[in-house]
A protein has these predicted regions:
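Surface-exposed amphipathic alpha-helical tracts and adjacent flexible/coil segments at the periphery
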Residues: 1-197
């Protein structure tokens, strides 16, 4: 059977074969103890010492999301779909697996040549959406794109949440945002400017 990762965090090295963590901290990524040095900010200099990028997360990749390629992967002979979930919370696993289950069920219903490998049907009492779970932005990870800039997340290694709008005005006591998302007391908000967060 052909297995393919379809969703989750990406390693700037070959996952499970990065030695940066072990060299700098003694924690082996090969044993599930990655210190995630790729998620730290770095400053990039050219050969003359001129700063090209300052305090950017230059090695931090977006998360893989191959929702749009799911049917093409099945057509290519993939029979095992993998979701990266190491150290993820239960809500993440529930949401993301439900998302892909719904997508697969829709394909199976439309394409009778595909046969389920198991019996039964799963019902969900929520609307799964990977944008609602922790993510660093999504990329199909060079599956369909040749633009390598679409795979990195240099401004932050954190989950940015949903886009809520554009800051229109800032005063000493308030911030005015033009957007369509409803906000509630206690919601966390990230601000991005021209140089990142």
């Amino acid at each position: 059977p052909l297995e393919v990762f379809i969703h989750g965090a990406l390693c700037v090295s070959y996952s499970g074969q990065c030695y940066l963590s072990h060299c700098l901290s003694g924690r082996s990524a090969n044993r599930g103890e990655c210190a995630q040095y790729c998620r730290l900010p770095y400053t990039l200099l050219d050969a003359d010492g001129k700063v090209l990028e300052k305090n950017k997360h230059l090695l931090s990749l977006k998360d893989m999301n191959r929702t749009d390629s799911l049917e093409a992967l099945l057509d290519a002979g993939v029979s095992s779909l993998k979701i990266e979930g190491r150290l993820k919370e239960m809500s993440y696993v529930k949401n993301v697996t439900a998302w892909y289950r719904k997508k697969l069920d829709a394909i199976l219903e439309r394409r009778p040549e595909y046969v389920r490998s198991s019996s039964g049907k799963t019902d969900f009492f929520f609307a799964p959406d990977p944008n609602k779970s922790f993510n660093r932005g999504f990329t199909p990870y060079l599956l369909n794109e040749k633009d390598s800039r679409s795979i990195s997340s240099p401004d932050t290694p954190k989950s940015m949440g949903e886009y809520i709008g554009t800051v229109k005005q800032v005063s000493s006591k308030s911030i005015t945002v033009a957007g369509v998302q409803k906000l509630n007391n206690g919601d966390g908000i990230c601000f991005f400017n021209e140089s990142g967060i």
